[in-house]
Amino acid sequence: MGCPEVQDRPGSGYELEETPAPVPVEPCLGSRPWTLSGGLSMVLKNIKYALKNIPKERVTRLCPEVESPLSERFRGLQTLDKSKCIGCGICANTCPNSAIKIVKAPIAPGSEKKRWFPQIDIGHCLFCGLCIDQCPKGALSSGKEYCKGMVKWAHKDLLMTPEKLAREVDIQEGDER
């Protein structure tokens, strides 16, 4: 509300002597007030459109039933060779999404000795391969796993600990550096 002709200017000595009538607010260009008939016709129009376009078969699926052939350049879930990893953290510093953290983990299942290894949150990973390219010892490599290993229902399941990353290779007690 306000009156464009008369404004109260504090400190100017000018005071409003009477309260002006409120100025009506004009609707925006192209807008019209919502009415029951207009809203109902819009809802019916959308229901008609939805019923017309209900497919008889599923258009998409959560996972393909048959795995697609992969190209040589495909970058899948990373694998970690714990015997080569020195825990330097270059992979974590290189990651553009900060998806890699360096954590202390056992050198082998059941071992009490721990070292620093990468932990990758594949929910944030771009699979760009920078961590693999920058690893000075070649401890990280790109796997070919893409559907079974990455489709999860909860985000916490997308956290790839060093134990999960080192699916094939673990350090033997005598090989530790």
Curated annotation (Swiss-Prot):
Residue segments, region Disordered: 1-21
Cofactor note: Binds 2 [4Fe-4S] cluster.
Binding site for [4Fe-4S] cluster 1: C85, C88, C91, C135
Catalytic activity: methanophenazine + reduced coenzyme F420-(gamma-L-Glu)(n) = dihydromethanophenazine + oxidized coenzyme F420-(gamma-L-Glu)(n) + H(+)
pH dependence per the entry: Optimum pH is 8.5.
GO CC, one annotated term: membrane
Temperature-dependent activity: Optimum temperature is 39 degrees Celsius.
Domain 4Fe-4S ferredoxin-type intervals: 76-105, 116-145
Record-listed [4Fe-4S] cluster 2 binding positions: C95, C125, C128, C131
Presence of the UniProt keyword Oxidoreductase in the record: yes
GO biological process, one term: aerobic respiration
Cofactor (UniProt): [4Fe-4S] cluster
InterPro entries to which the protein is assigned, alphabetical: 4Fe4S_Fe-S-bd, 4Fe4S_Fe_S_CS, F420H2_dehydrogenase_I, NADH_quinone_OxRdtase_chainI
Keywords: 4Fe-4S, Electron transport, Iron, Iron-sulfur, Metal-binding, Methanogenesis, Methanol utilization, Oxidoreductase, Repeat, Transport
KW Iron-sulfur (keyword) present: yes
EC number annotated for this UniProt entry: 1.5.98.3
A single GO molecular function term of this UniProt record: metal ion binding
Similarity annotation: Belongs to the complex I 23 kDa subunit family.
Quaternary data: The FPO complex is composed of at least 13 different subunits.
Role noted for this protein: Component of the F(420)H(2) dehydrogenase (FPO complex) which is part of the energy-conserving F(420)H(2):heterodisulfide oxidoreductase system. The membrane-bound electron transfer system of the complex plays an important role in the metabolism of methylotrophic methanogens when the organisms grow on methanol or methylamines. Catalyzes the oxidation of methanophenazine to dihydromethanophenazine. It shuttles electrons from F(420)H(2), via FAD and iron-sulfur (Fe-S) centers, to methanophenazine (an electron carrier in the membrane).
NCBIfam families reported for this sequence: F420_dehyd_FpoI
Stated name of the protein: F(420)H(2) dehydrogenase subunit I
Organism: Methanosarcina mazei (strain ATCC BAA-159 / DSM 3647 / Goe1 / Go1 / JCM 11833 / OCM 88) (Methanosarcina frisia)
Name of the gene this protein is made from: fpoI
